[in-house]
Structure formats: C-alpha cells, structure tokens
C-alpha cells in the first residue's frame, strides 16, 4: 500500500499455540506504528487437536481477509523436551503459515527472544509484561 510519499504496511503477528494462539495487527507508516488489533484465540476448551488446527486456520484466514496484511511475522519453533508438545506446536505453526501462503502473503519467522526484545525495546525484564 502506498499513500502520498510514505509507505504504509500492515503486519499480522502470530504467536501460534494449541492452547492459545496470540495475534496482533499493526500498521506501520514511516516511523509511526498503530495497533489495529491485539487478541487471542482460546483453544483450551477443545479436546480434538484437529479441530484446534481447523480453528487456527479459519481465524488466520479471517484476519487476513479483514485486514489484508502485507506480511506475516510468526514466532519460529523453539526446542523443548516434550516431543509430542513440539509436534503439536509445529502443526499449529504450519497451519497458520499455510493460511498466509494460500493468500500469497510473505511470511517471516522470528525467534521468541527476538520478538520479546523488540516488544520491550531491548529490556529483558519486560518479557513478563509481554507475557501478560
């Protein structure tokens, strides 16, 4: 999107999960940033893993169709000790990415630490605030 002399970009950020999928939309224009939406999809009440994946896909598509983002930023996989949890998380990430790819939206993965640091302007202590 382009308006006058300053480029405008909408970014959909996704923190995928099978219990809670966090998401936020921002509009960046020059050096200013505007929050469009910050929310979460609660999935804890559903026991069927495949239903959760379907809901993640549908919500991601709904966000894309509503806000028409220029790109998607998604939290990259991290390595944990529980293999089953990692597989479920990987599927959630893949489903969210597939939704973006189906609409031909560029996707960039960021490490969890990089995302937390960006949200806090370099203050590690701020991670607790991001979590809330």
Task: Give residue ranges: language-model regions.
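Phosphate- and other anionic-substrate recognition elements at nucleic-acid/protein interfaces
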Residues: 1-132
């Amino acid at each position: 999107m382009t308006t006058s002399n300053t480029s405008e970009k909408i970014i959909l950020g996704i923190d995928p999960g099978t219990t809670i999928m966090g998401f936020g939309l921002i509009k960046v224009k020059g050096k200013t940033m505007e929050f469009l939406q910050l929310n979460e999809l609660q999935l804890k009440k559903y026991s069927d893993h495949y239903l959760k994946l379907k809901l993640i896909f549908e919500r991601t598509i709904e966000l894309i169709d509503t806000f028409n983002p220029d790109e998607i930023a998604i939290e990259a996989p991290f390595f944990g000790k529980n293999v089953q949890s990692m597989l479920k998380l990987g599927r959630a990430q893949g489903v969210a990415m597939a939704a973006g790819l189906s609409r031909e939206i560029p996707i960039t993965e960021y490490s969890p630490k990089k995302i937390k640091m960006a949200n806090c302007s370099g203050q590690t202590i701020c991670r607790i605030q991001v979590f809330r």
